[in-house]
Amino acid sequence: MTRLDTPSMPSVDGVLQQSIHDIDIPPRPKIIDQIRAEMNSDAPNLRGIAGLINLDVSLAAGLIKTANSPYFGFGRRARSAHEALTMLGLDVTCRAIAAISLRRAFPNSAHYERFWHASASVATLSGWLAQQRRVPGVRADDAYTYGLFRDCGIVILLRRYPAYQGILAGANLDRDMPFTAVEQAALPTDHTVVGCLLAQNWWLPGEICAAIRHHHSLLALVEPVSPLKMPGRYLVAIAQTAEYLLQQLTGGSRTEEWAKLGPACCDLLALDDAGLAEICREAEPLLHLVE
C-alpha cells in the first residue's frame, strides 16, 4: 500500500492566520488520526479500524451508506463497517469519515439546518457532475467531499461573529466586488481562509484545501499562473455549477457568483448553454435523494 503523503498546504497569510486563532475551528476527530496512522503503517489493521468505527453507530451507518452510494458502483452492497472499509479503501474512508463528522462538529447545528441541506445538495450534485463530465483527475468522491466542505467556514463565522449574517447577505448580492472582499471589508478574515484551515487540520487532500481557499477567485480559474492546479480548478467549477443547478431547480437563495464565475466554470467543464440546460433537467431527480 502506498503511504499517504502529507497534504500540500496552501499558503495562508500569517497575519490572517493569527487573526483567526481564536475563532474556534472544530478539532480534528480522533478517528481520522487513527485511520491515518494505519494508512502509514506497513500492515494496516482494517479490522481494528472497523472496530473503532463500530463504536459510533451513526458513523458506521454513514460509512456503509457511503460505500453503497451509486458513485462507486460496487457490484455488491456493504453490510458492515469492515466490508465498507474494505471496499472503499483507507484513503476514501478517511475522507468519508471527515464528511460524516463535519456536521456533528458544530454544537446546535440544527440552527443551520438550511445551510447543511444546501451543502449536502451541492455535494451530491458535485459528485454526480464529476461522473457525468468525466473530469480529468477528479473522482466523484473528491467532488462530493469538496462540495460538502467548500463553505464550512461560513458556519464557523456565523457562530463567531453575530454580525456575519448581514455581511454574508451583502456578499451574496454584491455584483462588483469579489465575495471574499466584501467579507474582508468587515472582518479580519473570510470564510475561504477559515474553511481552508479546517480542511488542512482535518487532513483533507491538498487540492481540496486549495480549492476551498480560492473558490471565489476568478483569476485562480482562468490565469495560466494560478494557486490552483487543474484538478483544483475543476473542483471549483464543478461545485459552482452544482450550486447554480441547485438554485435553478429549487428557487433557493440566489447570489451573484454565477454571473462572476459561471462563464469560466462552463469553459472548464466544456458546457455550452444547451449542455447546461440538459444537465439541469437530468439533475432534478437527484435532489430527492438528499437527506
Whereabouts are the PLM-identified features?
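GAF sensory/regulatory domain recognition
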Residues: A171-D176
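Conserved alpha-helical "signature site"
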Residues: M1-Y164, M177-W258, P285
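Helix-termination/interfacial motifs at the ends of transmembrane alpha-helices
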Residues: Q165-A169
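Terminal targeting/low-complexity segments that flank the catalytic cores of oxidoreductases
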Residues: M1-S8, A270-E291
